[in-house]
Amino acid sequence: MTDLTEKNTALEEKIESAVENQQKSIWKEIFAQGIWKNNPAVVQLLGLCPLLAVSSTATNALGLGLATMLVLTCTNTVISLFRQYIPKEIRIPIYVMIIATTVTAVQLLMNAYTYTLYQSLGIFIPLIVTNCIIIGRAEAFASKNSLLHSIWDGFSMGLGMALSLTILGALREIIGQGTIFEGIENLFGEQAKFLTHHIYHTDSSFLLFILPPGAFIGLGLLLAIKNRIDNIKK
């Protein structure tokens, strides 16, 4: 009888361990999908309008990236929380309404606390509503998965988007103007001024990388680098 009890206890411990490992792997996979494997910017190629238009500087790119990440996380949270109460027939209009409400809140916050950056980003803040990645994650993930997993998915996808935006913005700013994180104090306050660096000094900027053609060239470089790394891993 004692041996049977010990075997049952050992079996329960193995099952608990297997479930715990499975849960950890799910969290890791969701994060990896957002950051690298299914990155919204350099894999899915979604949200190209703000990606190309706003990434002229690292500060602008980071500001829009953080706003997008906040919107993604909040909308995934709300949609997952109420997924059982949203009628399938009208789910898309409801998703758009939730996204628009969240974007409006973020827009008002940026207007209040980062006004200079708000002016710099302009129309691209409200245009977050039309970003395909947000409604895509709502439909593909948040409406079908648990609350915590949906929050993590929104954060991971948003972080992947923000990283891609910031890297592209930094690349264009360094080559085009010789600086990085110029005007970062408009986003994080005067205490963040130490992040601004002048890589090289020039009398005239390299306009090609500041203008839209530079955005396409920079994005092409990022895609090439990612594909190269993926091929090496294989």
From Swiss-Prot:
Gene Ontology cellular component annotations, sorted alphabetically: plasma membrane
A biological process term (GO) from this entry: electron transport chain
Predominant location: membrane
Q: Where are the transmembrane segments?
A: 62-82, 92-112, 116-136, 151-171, 205-225
Disulfide linkages recorded for this protein, renumbered to the chain, are none
Q: Which family does it belong to?
A: Belongs to the NqrDE/RnfAE family.
Q: Which NCBIfam families match?
A: PRK12405.1, rnfE
Q: What is this protein called?
A: Ion-translocating oxidoreductase complex subunit E
What is the species listed in this Swiss-Prot or TrEMBL entry? Haemophilus influenzae (strain PittGG)
Q: What is the lineage of its organism?
A: Bacteria, Pseudomonadati, Pseudomonadota, Gammaproteobacteria, Pasteurellales
Gene for this chain: rnfE
